[in-house]
Amino acid sequence: MTNYTHVAGRVHADQASDDWWREAVIYQIYPKPWADSNGDGIGDLNGVRQNLEYLAELGVDAIWFSPFFVGPQTDGGYDVADYRDIDPMFGTLADAEALIREAHRVGLKIIIDVVPNHTSVAHRFFKAALSTPPGSPEWQRYHLVRGQGEHGELPPNDWVSIFSGPAWTQTHFAGQPTGYWYLHIFDAGQPDVNWNHPDIVDEFDHTLRFWFDRGVDGFRIDVAHGLVDRKSTRLNSSH
């Protein structure tokens, strides 16, 4: 799937203003179905790189990449396990760096999706949380709340996820239910992170710096409206 946005006239490659994106022609690419360079039936970064001049000739100013990070890929790549590496189905980090260099050579800018509202259950932070008992420091990186009922066997409240069904999934430790549930506004494989925790802030600060260092020109922040201070939110109450 691809789509593009023509905001206004074409932006010149030498435009130095930080506001370049306001008038840019931005073309979105989901890598998986876009261009396959090696015949395995899956679009990849090298496939995009081979078509950069074509995109420039169309009048595109910038490419907005939907996630190409390592992850289970159960939600189109928006379930990220490693924000600083490329999923092997799309190529390698070296492929990404080569694509960015070539894009700049032909006058294109690169924007990538960053997903800071949640991680994948395969992210090292979440795996660390589930490998420790309730109340551990690792738990504090996510929204883990005691359930209702004598043993916490019921969800903390009646919140419904955007993908339907409860916005809570019960956790287990040593094979037994803990009575604690984690919040996921989207799929159960996408636990919401706690932006009040310094480890989360550091993780995404490092991620943005990592990609800026590799030449990325900007970011599209997924679920930006979800990045709010939740200290005052009663996660164990109903709407």
Where are these regions (language model features)?
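Acidic/aromatic-lined carbohydrate-recognition and catalytic surfaces
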Residues: 2-205, 209, 213, 225-234
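Receiver (REC) domain switch/active-site residues of two-component response regulators
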Residues: 217
